[in-house]
UniProtKB/Swiss-Prot annotation:
Required for primary cilia formation and promotes the localization of the ciliopathy protein BBS4 to both centriolar satellites and cilia. It is found in: Cytoplasm, Cytoskeleton, Microtubule organizing center, Centrosome, Centriolar satellite; Cytoplasm, Cytoskeleton, Cilium basal body. This is Coiled-coil domain-containing protein 13. Residues 16-105, 134-458, 554-608, 653-683 form a coiled coil. Interacts with PCM1, CEP290 and PCNT. GO terms for biological process: cytoplasmic microtubule organization; DNA damage response; non-motile cilium assembly. Residues 28-45 have a biased composition (Basic and acidic residues). GO terms for cellular component: cell projection; centriolar satellite; centrosome; cytoplasm. The modification Phosphoserine is found at S258, S469, S536. Keywords: Cell projection, Cilium biogenesis/degradation, Coiled coil, Cytoplasm, Cytoskeleton, Phosphoprotein. The gene is CCDC13.
């Protein structure tokens, strides 16, 4: 604003100086007018004296045309001076307009430099914020282009005004030449003085300054000629076509500016032929009239030698009067033409004045617009600084979020690898267990076959008298089978199922720990914009982008929290599964050891059949103690207590067989329980994978909903 005020003050001072120069010029012109009038009067007096001496009649006839000529010359001089004044005013206005245009060009260049600096400053930004900054810069560049277009329009108008000034100067020069020619016909000594005055006017410093300006404008026009060569070629082609129709050496602008309708070559030829015929008729009439007058004069004055001096003077006076009348008629026609031209020039000057007023008003509006643009640019700079700070903060937040996402991805990758490895291990364990179960089933079948063979052998060795003992053994055998102590294997299975249920409760906890993104409380925005910038549309756009980034951040946090919870659940499951696998491996080792012991004991029984009968007799005595031992037997107790070789050797064969059958049944049940546990573990892992996919789907849905809300808010 200070620069605008200083420029306005300088323009005012320059305008005052120009006005003073114009006043001085007017004073000089008035003095020159007075000198010219005095010189004209003195010349008229000098011419009147010999005429009075010659004859009184000649004074009367000669005074009238001199007064008419002087009046016409004064009128023409006044009009010329008026035109010169108008030219000076237009030149001054053009000078002011040039200065204003230069100032606007300087301001536009300054704004362009600022915009380029802002562009270089914003090239480092990326993402959505960079796109918004780029759109802002594009809008500012569009505004600058509009201003440049307006300034170019003003420049073209000024150039048109300068061209018009040149045309007016040419017309003035032609008018001066006409006046000099007329003055030469009327008075011999007058033209040199007028030409000297015109030369003095042309040699003034203001005229030189105008000529320098004209030279500068011509140089500028020469720079633009290179750009107009293509247009000139097209114009040449059009001019060739017009020359075929209109004729050569004809200005197209005159044809366009002519008020009448345009006529072709054939029509012009017809019109010119009619005009030639009319002029020939007029010439014939004029010749006949001149011949008639000459014959009358000859008839009245047959011989000029016989005429007296007075008659000769009268004839001479009449001829002079005729010549003067013809000259006056010509001058009157020329005066009418000049008056018409002056009226046209006045109209054009009025149009130029109105146009200059419009240009001045437009320049004022441009000044106001430039002031508003400067203020807006300052506000935009402040806004851009604030937005840049927010962008930096958001970039830092995004960087931290990206690091967290990378960490979560790495952890997920490790988890996937662990899960895959665990699945492979579990599959391998299942295959091993299946193979072991098949082996055990084969061994059980072999043992059953051997037991059947032993029973048959035992029954053959026994006699009929030993049937009572057999009857006593059979209820013991049935009692041993129906003993409730042997039904503790389902309890162990129930314990195992309880453990599996606890592991499944962990999976249920895994489900409950995950919260939906819609029920999650929205986090407060860490960086809020200042309220003074909340009304602008640019700030609304930035707020929309910030809200989008917040939505991304919230979704990432939800996903991170849920993944951490899922990781903790999976770690717990892995620990539990590892503990279970260790327990199952330990149990398998114990069962293998037991099977080896049983196989050894069976081989001893085969080798010692006599000892078996003795031990069978002692079976009723140990009948009450056996159920207690069987009641105490369970999968967990077998892990803590193993029967010694001495105890197994003391037990009779039938009880040993019953105990072996019960143990085999227990082992089969345990194998089935292990199979069920492995199947439940696999199902739990499948559910965990499904839950993980559901988590990802929920996070995606939350993110899409946030994006849709942002889009609807923008619209």
């Amino acid at each position: 604003m200070a620069a605008d005020e200083s420029s306005q003050n300088t323009l005012r001072l320059q305008f005052k100086a120009m006005q003073e120069m114009q006043h001085k010029r007017l004073q000089k012109q008035m003095e020159k007018k007075r000198e010219k009038e005095l010189s004209l009067k003195s010349r008229a007096d000098d011419q009147e004296e010999p005429l009075e001496v010659s004859d009184g009649l000649s004074l009367l006839h000669a005074g009238e045309p001199n007064s008419k000529n002087s009046f016409e010359k004064r009128v023409l001089e006044d009009e010329i001076e008026h035109l010169r004044n108008e030219l000076r005013e237009t030149v001054d206005e053009n000078g002011r307009l040039y200065k204003l245009l230069k100032e606007r060009d300087f301001e536009i260049k300054h704004l362009k430099k600022k915009i380029e600096e802002d562009r270089f400053a914003f090239t480092g930004t990326a993402g959505v914020a960079g796109d918004v900054v780029a759109t802002k810069i594009v809008e500012l560049s569009k505004k600058n282009r509009l201003l440049m277009a307006e300034s170019e329009g003003a420049k073209t108008r000024v150039k048109q005004l300068t061209n018009r000034i040149q045309e007016l100067e040419r017309e003035l020069q032609t008018a001066l030449t006409r006046l000099s020619a007329k003055g030469a016909t009327d008075a011999g000594a007058k033209p040199p003085r007028a030409q000297m005055g015109d030369r003095a006017l042309l040699e003034t410093p203001e005229v030189k300054a105008l000529q320098d300006r004209l030279v500068a404008t011509n140089l500028k026009m020469s720079d633009l000629r290179n750009q107009i060569q293509s247009v000139k070629q097209e114009l040449r082609m059009a001019q060739k076509v017009l020359a075929r129709e209109v004729g050569e050496d004809i200005n197209v602008q005159q044809l366009l500016s002519s008020p009448g309708t345009w006529r072709g070559r054939a029509q012009q030829i017809l019109v010119l032929q009619s005009k030639v015929q009319e002029l020939e008729k007029q010439l014939g009439q004029a010749r006949s009239q001149s011949a008639g007058t000459a014959s009358d004069e000859l008839s009245v004055y047959p011989d000029p030698r016989k005429l007296s001096a007075q008659e000769k003077n009268l004839l001479r006076i009449r001829s002079l009067e005729r010549e003067k009348q013809e000259g006056l008629e010509k001058l009157a026609s020329e005066r009418d033409v000049l008056q018409r031209e002056l009226e046209e020039l006045k109209k054009k000057f009025e149009g130029m004045r109105s146009r200059n007023k419009l240009l001045s008003s437009e320049m004022k509006t441009l000044k106001s617009q430039m002031g508003t643009l400067v203020e807006k640019g300052r506000h935009d700079d402040e806004l851009i600084d604030a937005l840049m700070d927010q962008l930096k903060q958001l970039q830092e937040i995004l960087g931290s979020l990206s690091l967290q996402e990378e960490k979560t991805r790495v952890s997920q990758h490790h988890l996937d690898q662990q899960l895959n490895s665990e699945a492979q291990r579990s599959n391998s364990l299942v295959a091993q267990l299946q193979a072991m179960v098949a082996e055990r089933e084969a061994k059980v079948r072999q043992l059953e076959m051997e037991i059947g063979q032993l029973n048959v052998h035992y029954l053959r060795n026994k006699g009929v008298g030993e049937g009572s003992s057999g009857r006593e053994v059979s209820p013991a055998y049935t009692q041993f089978l129906e003993d409730p102590g042997l039904t503790k294997s389902p309890a162990s299975a129930g314990d195992h199922v309880g453990r599996l249920g606890s592991s499944r409760s962990v999976t249920s906890l895994g489900h409950t720990l995950v919260e939906s993104a819609l029920t999650r409380p929205s986090l407060p925005s860490p960086h809020r914009t200042s309220p003074r910038f909340s009304d602008s549309p640019e700030q609304k756009g930035w707020q929309a982008q910030v809200s989008e980034i917040k939505a991304l951040w919230q979704a990432a946090e939800v996903e991170r929290d849920r993944l951490t919870e899922f990781v903790t659940v999976l770690q717990k499951r892995v620990e539990e599964s590892n503990s279970k696998l260790l327990e199952s491996e330990r149990k398998l080792q114990e069962e293998r050891h037991r099977t080896v012991v049983l196989e050894q004991h069976l081989e001893k029984i085969r080798l010692e059949p006599g000892k078996a009968s003795a031990s069978q007799r002692a079976a009723p005595r140990t009948k009450t103690g056996l159920p207690t031992s069987n009641n105490r037997h369970n999968p967990t107790g077998s892990e803590k207590k193993d029967p010694s070789f001495a105890q197994l050797s003391d037990v009779p064969v039938e009880s040993q067989m019953e105990e072996l059958t019960t143990r085999l049944a227990i082992q089969v049940e345990e194998n089935e329980m292990l199979k069920a546990a492995l199947g439940s573990a696999l199902r739990g892992k499948e559910e965990d994978f499904r839950m993980y996919h559901e988590i990802l789907g929920q996070v995606k849905s939350v993110f899409l909903q946030a994006l849709r809300q942002q889009k609807t808010g923008k619209q």
